[in-house]
């Protein structure tokens, strides 16, 4: 099997993290070299930036500052972890990537998708995923899931009002339309077992 850069996207509470935790052992059993990582984060520098981005008390953070911090974390994560893994023929499963910035900062924050895309083109040197799975869910459903997850730490973005989260979903749907050649929309409001089966099939079809 060959390596592949796969990103998992979706609004808050869409089940990205749970999905990736289930995909990892599945592909390991198939003797596919596989690695799971996340954005912002995945390596020390980017995890430190994540801490800054998620601090609840930093409500004064300006939208451009936010976008640039995400891009900085993305750059370091890409060159330090993702690219070396792809060179070693790994299947890389990444929780969020550039599409999150387009939906959250580009659309929901109002910076403009084209501007945010250009920032990230500079950061990534046009290194894009081969496949993106977008987990679509109504904001009310996703936020309700978060509310029931006692073990999940509430971050700054979780504290935004419902109108912000609705804009995030609207932004994602525009991103899906814009990059339909690499993004597959999957309904996240279904039992996790069915969701895993559907996503496994999509990834395996791409690996062949």
Swiss-Prot record:
Matching Pfam families: Thymidylate_kin (PF02223)
Q: What is its EC number?
A: 2.7.4.9
UniProt cross-references to InterPro entries, sorted A to Z? P-loop_NTPase, Thymidylate_kin-like_dom, Thymidylate_kin_CS, Thymidylate_kinase
A GO CC term? cytosol
Q: Does the keyword ATP-binding apply?
A: yes
Sorted keywords for this record are: ATP-binding, Kinase, Nucleotide biosynthesis, Nucleotide-binding, Transferase
Query: Where along the chain is ATP bound?
Result: 10-17
Q: Which reaction does it catalyse?
A: dTMP + ATP = dTDP + ADP
**Which superkingdom, per the lineage?**
Bacteria
Q: GO terms for biological process? A: dTDP biosynthetic process; dTTP biosynthetic process; dUDP biosynthetic process
Which top-level enzyme class is recorded in the Swiss-Prot or TrEMBL entry?
Answer: transferase
Q: Name one GO molecular function term.
A: ATP binding
Q: Which HAMAP family match?
A: Thymidylate_kinase
Family assignment from sequence similarity = Belongs to the thymidylate kinase family.
Q: What does this protein do?
A: Phosphorylation of dTMP to form dTDP in both de novo and salvage pathways of dTTP synthesis.
- Fetch the PANTHER family from UniProt: THYMIDYLATE KINASE, UMP-CMP KINASE 2, MITOCHONDRIAL
What's the protein called, per UniProt? Thymidylate kinase
Q: Which organism is it from?
A: Bacillus mycoides (strain KBAB4) (Bacillus weihenstephanensis)
Source lineage: Bacteria, Bacillati, Bacillota, Bacilli, Bacillales
């Amino acid at each position: 099997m060959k390596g592949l850069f796969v990103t998992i996207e979706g609004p808050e509470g869409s089940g990205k993290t749970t999905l990736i935790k289930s995909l990892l052992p599945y592909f390991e059993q198939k003797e596919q070299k596989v690695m799971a990582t996340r954005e912002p984060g995945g390596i020390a520098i980017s995890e430190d930036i994540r801490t800054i981005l998620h601090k609840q008390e930093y409500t004064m953070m300006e939208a451009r500052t936010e976008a640039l911090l995400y891009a900085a974390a993305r750059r370091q994560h890409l060159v330090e972890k993702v690219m070396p893994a792809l060179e070693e023929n790994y299947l890389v499963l990444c929780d969020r990537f550039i599409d999150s910035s387009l939906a959250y900062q580009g659309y929901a924050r109002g910076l403009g998708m084209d501007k945010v895309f250009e920032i990230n083109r500079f950061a990534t040197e046009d290194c894009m995923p081969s496949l993106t799975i977008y987990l679509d869910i109504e904001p009310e459903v996703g936020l309700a899931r978060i509310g029931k997850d006692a073990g999940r730490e509430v971050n700054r973005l979780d504290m935004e009002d419902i109108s912000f989260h609705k804009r995030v979903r609207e932004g994602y749907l525009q991103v899906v339309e814009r990059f339909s050649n690499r993004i597959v929309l999957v309904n996240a409001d279904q039992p996790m077992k069915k969701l895993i089966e559907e996503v496994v099939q999509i990834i395996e079809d791409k690996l062949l």
